[in-house]
Amino acid sequence: MKVLTDLQKRIFAIVKKENGKPIPPGIVVRMMENQAGFPGKQQVYRAIDDLLEWHIFRKSGGATNQLLINYELADPVLDQKFQGILNLGNKNTGFVRPLDDDKTVYYIHFSNLAGALDGDLVEFCPLDKPQVGDKFDAAVLKIVKRSRVLYAGNFLIEYSDFGQEFRIVADNPRFYLTPIVNKASVPAELESNTKVAFQIDEYDPANNLCKVSIQQILGNNDEPLINLKAIMLDHSIVFEDNDVVEQQAAKLQFDEKEQSKPYRKDLTELAFVTIDPATSKDLDDAIYVKRTDKGFVLYVAIADVAYYVQRNSELDIEARHKTSSIYLPGYYVVPMLPERLSNELCSLNPNEKRYVVVCELNFDHEARLNFSEVYPATIVSQRRFAYSEVNDWLEDSDALKDESATVLESLKAGFTLSELIAEQRKKKGTIDLSHSETEVVVDQNYYPIEIRFLTHGKAETMIENLMVVANEAVAWTLTNHKVHLPYRVHPRPSKKKLQMLLENIVELKITQPNFVLDTVTSTQIAAWLKENKDNPSYDIFVILLLRTLGKAFYIVNPLIHFSIGSHHYTHFTSPIRRYADLTVHRLLWMNLFTPERFTDTEREQLNAELEQICETINDTEIKINGCERTANDYLTTLYLSKQVGQTFHGFISAITSFGIFMRMDENNFDGLIKITSIPEDFFVFEKDRMVLRGKRTNKVFRIGDRLTAKLTEIDTVQKRAILTLV
């Protein structure tokens, strides 16, 4: 419990007299000016800031950010019980939406969490209090289901006058409970500063305590690889070694008899090549392009994973559980399939026969699609290219002077076709959201040694364009055969989100759009981006637009993929690393290629499972994306820890009530400038304009503003770089 100063008690008394009504901070200051012993505006604002930091006050959330007492005793409305997933913020106050009503938001103060943690399924009820803004106050009644069984933390041994004590510091900053370690669960050989996985045995919500037992020893807390594994565990990505799956994969062989089957075409004479990152080992796709009198023929050959991974086998069950391969920074990969498949039998390695599913597309001279077909085939990849090799060749034709003429002609035709496809897709409304990206380079022990800006060359663009048209063609093929499938969709952004975007870019001098928010099309968004291509704030504009557009996901209904400008889109081209693609391949086999080999019951069973498959993939994708972001933040801050004291340049990428995020030019990472560290004034967050404004000087910080700041601290708990203005 915080002990309030006399000044803070006086401020608290003023707010309390409002009986739950919001009061602006400026009015509090004005009322105190009439009291004896007024310490000055700056001191009052600093005291208010402390009360907000301690959760004693909260802001109303409206445009004026008025003050409310954060937690008051109120009766629970027990005849209105709901269930929902709890989302905790950095200050461990929560928000929850009922499972059957995602529009109503309930605010749960730290005191009303009842021991629930971020991601838990909880039962909650509203409190008998007035609604504030667009949120209701609520309290957790019970934890229905924990979001995970295991949590990661650093095990410490400490010594005091009372002897040896065990302590665990949880990795997740939102794990607010204090762990009390069950000594019986501590192995005798366990050393201090060891990363462990622990489970909650009991919890005491009144005192924010929990009794825990150690379940796994992960390794030395200072080793990056151990921390990457702990990050996966903390995002509920826990995959045990499965001997049955590995044994099943080890028995699989390339069967020469399969290539003579009547349903499988022999394309081994065509000059297929693969083009991938230099470090890739799982080569899903190969291409061959030829020019004809009528235009172009594109062959997109994709690894025939469904041939090897039979439905409901141990391999399939494990892949469905994982839903995709995981690629963490530093090339740490957790494959969806055993390496026997992902890197060998299914991977389209050069000079080896491989079974594939081919999408053959015939275009006219302007890359308008005339027709397409999908079928099983056998190919031999003639060359394994890295993107960098092909990009070098585009700059210098002698770079591949020893390659066969057939391969080079295919590459030339592929680039021409890709550029024409890009023009056609612009007409359909494909949105170019490319912006600067980085990767963390690590040494053999996963210690970060460099932050490198990624180059996106013409080779990468070509493969993207060719894969997109193949994905779309397969979606249309299955749809035309009345086969249900997992569509990849990206809904149109809501009017509310677009309105927020327009408010956020007011200060960026971005050209205002001339479209109607309710009916905006991707073509209009693409044109808006093009209009502002030369704006100095273009990069931050793209970042804000990405946040507005939201996330793509899988669903059985054919909704629009807004950013691609497609009404029927799926994922077909990466079955080695995505279960959605493997499912699409399986649907092709069961309904188009060899329907006679499957029963109607099998088709009906898979059809009935599609919705659950999509839901599982969507949920896991969120976890994996969060895991990848956390891993990147960890390695980046570990790298920056050696640069404390150095000066960086950048622009404001986000503004919050607690500070400014500056994206550093040198590494593309967002560092935090705390609002309390900004000198010369007390700054207030104006949410309606997304600016910080000084109360005395009226100085304003806006998104997109250029700044210079010094790196003063690395917050290893939040995985943040802390900056101060210079």
From Swiss-Prot:
Gene3D superfamilies: Nucleic acid-binding proteins. Its EC number is 3.1.13.1. It catalyses: Exonucleolytic cleavage in the 3'- to 5'-direction to yield nucleoside 5'-phosphates. Keywords: Cytoplasm, Exonuclease, Hydrolase, Nuclease, RNA-binding. GO terms for cellular component: cytosol. Its main location: cytoplasm. CDD domains: S1_RNase_R (cd04471). One of its GO terms (molecular function) is RNA binding. Residues 264-592 form the RNB domain. 3'-5' exoribonuclease that releases 5'-nucleoside monophosphates and is involved in maturation of structured RNAs. HAMAP family: RNase_R. This is Ribonuclease R. It comes from Mycoplasma pneumoniae (strain ATCC 29342 / M129 / Subtype 1) (Mycoplasmoides pneumoniae). The lineage of its organism: Bacteria, Bacillati, Mycoplasmatota, Mycoplasmoidales, Mycoplasmoidaceae. The gene is rnr.
